[in-house]
Amino acid sequence: MAAQVIPELQSLNLKTEGGALPQELAPSGAPENEDGDSEDDNGDDQGADESRTIEVLAAKKKKKKKPKKKKKDTQKAQTEPPRVILSALFPNNEYPVGELVEYKDENAYRTTNEEKRYLDRMNNDFLSEYRYAAEVHKQVRQYAQKTIKPGQTLTEIAEGIEDSVRALTGHDGLTEGDNLLGGIAFPTGVNLNNCAAHYSPNAGNKMVLQYEDVMKVDFGVHMNGRIVDSAFTIAFDPVYDNLLAAVKDATNTGIREAGIDVRMSDIGAAIQEAMESYEVEIKGTTYPVKAIRNLNGHTIGQFEIHGGKNGKSVPIVKGGDQSKMEEGEVYAIETFGSTGRGYVRDDMETSHYAKVPDAPNVPLRLSSAKNLLNVITKNFGTLPFCRRYLDRLRQDKYLLGLNNLVANGLVDAYPPLCDIKGSYTAQFEHTILLRPNIKEVISRGDDY
């Protein structure tokens, strides 16, 4: 803000060039110099005139109002819980940059190559949308990490996160098509203990978070379909610290190894080596931390959380996929560790669903299925949704129609994925952008 200049009083020139007062300041009826007046008299009269003139000017200056000071621009701060739309906190539309990691080895030239830097500058809208979504994610999760406590229901936790995302993006998702502009990218996962992924409470769920629980919190934010997918694990009992440390280390290893032309199998091998170097002691028994071999990271496409039909997977164990990462791709680098078998299966009640991209045109006989497909298309497109989101849109008695859409291959169901009962699982995840000249960990924050 430009400094406000308060004008100083200027020195007054009280005489004209001839030595007389300016006419407009001369007292009315003052006699001009006459012959015979003594020099002293002239001096006395002139001094009196000057005194009166100064008094007149001083009176005028007293009446003159000082210019009002401009109010200082005050930077808005986020509330608790987060409810201030992000654009109000960043009125210039310049959002924080993620962690920048230079490419290494044979790709090191990309950091200084002018052509690559030029290509990178072409992506301003793309980067702005991603950074907006990432900053929303960071602000929401940092508040969640401070306030999630034992005794809360899983529904309270999930809806608290979702309400904050809607407020900060400015999209409550209640108007048709609003959620496609920005907001929640997929249902909030609140996965306990042996359940690793895809669990979100349905209506009526009374499950309560306990002190002994290990909870994976996985949620997404999008702006114009640019999805930021990031997850963390909460445990109140320090006995699980090594489990969390193993998975966090593995995720950071995957991020470090990822890059243009890097083979997926090499990333998976590095992740597994990092994670399985840890063990955890629980109630007197020591468990090796195992990478969950049938869970993977993945590419992210616009409005497509798993990258669509050309999507790629990032393994978290050695062997397998020999394909390479490519310039311009977006990845969710996520790793899962377990004290169990290191393998998950479908279990419990399904909450997550998503419309199948480019699904064939299937004639639907159930009117409830037709109507529901129309609601899903207009409000979520190919973004995943859960049954609570249909409840918010005042849909009722939709389960028969939803199951019919799944049976006809128009909607995919994603049941919760769980290891053996009694085991504990952990997850950490970040979204990375493989920009032409640098790698940006878009969701990196001070927390993880």
Curated annotation (Swiss-Prot):
Binding site residues for a divalent metal cation 1: D218, D229, E429
Compositionally skewed regions (Basic residues) per UniProt: 59-73
Membrane-spanning residues: none
Signal sequence residues: none
Stretches with biased composition (Acidic residues): 32-48
Entry keywords, A to Z: Aminopeptidase, Cytoplasm, Hydrolase, Metal-binding, Protease
Gene3D superfamilies according to UniProt: Creatinase/methionine aminopeptidase superfamily, Winged helix-like DNA-binding domain superfamily/Winged helix DNA-binding domain
Region (Disordered): 1-83
Record GO terms (molecular function): initiator methionyl aminopeptidase activity; metal ion binding; metalloaminopeptidase activity
GO CC annotations on file: cytoplasm
Cofactor binding remark: Binds 2 divalent metal cations per subunit. Has a high-affinity and a low affinity metal-binding site. The true nature of the physiological cofactor is under debate. The enzyme is active with cobalt, zinc, manganese or divalent iron ions. Most likely, methionine aminopeptidases function as mononuclear Fe(2+)-metalloproteases under physiological conditions, and the catalytically relevant metal-binding site has been assigned to the histidine-containing high-affinity site.
Binding site for substrate: H198, H306
Reactions the enzyme catalyzes: Release of N-terminal amino acids, preferentially methionine, from peptides and arylamides
EC number, UniProt record: 3.4.11.18
Cofactor(s) essential for the protein: Co(2+); Zn(2+); Mn(2+); Fe(2+)
Pfam family, one: Peptidase_M24
UniProt-annotated location(s): Cytoplasm
Lineage top rank: taxon: Eukaryota
Function (record text): Cotranslationally removes the N-terminal methionine from nascent proteins. The N-terminal methionine is often cleaved when the second residue in the primary sequence is small and uncharged (Met-Ala-, Cys, Gly, Pro, Ser, Thr, or Val).
Family: Belongs to the peptidase M24A family. Methionine aminopeptidase eukaryotic type 2 subfamily.
HAMAP family xref list: MetAP_2_euk (MF_03175)
Protein name (record): Methionine aminopeptidase 2-1
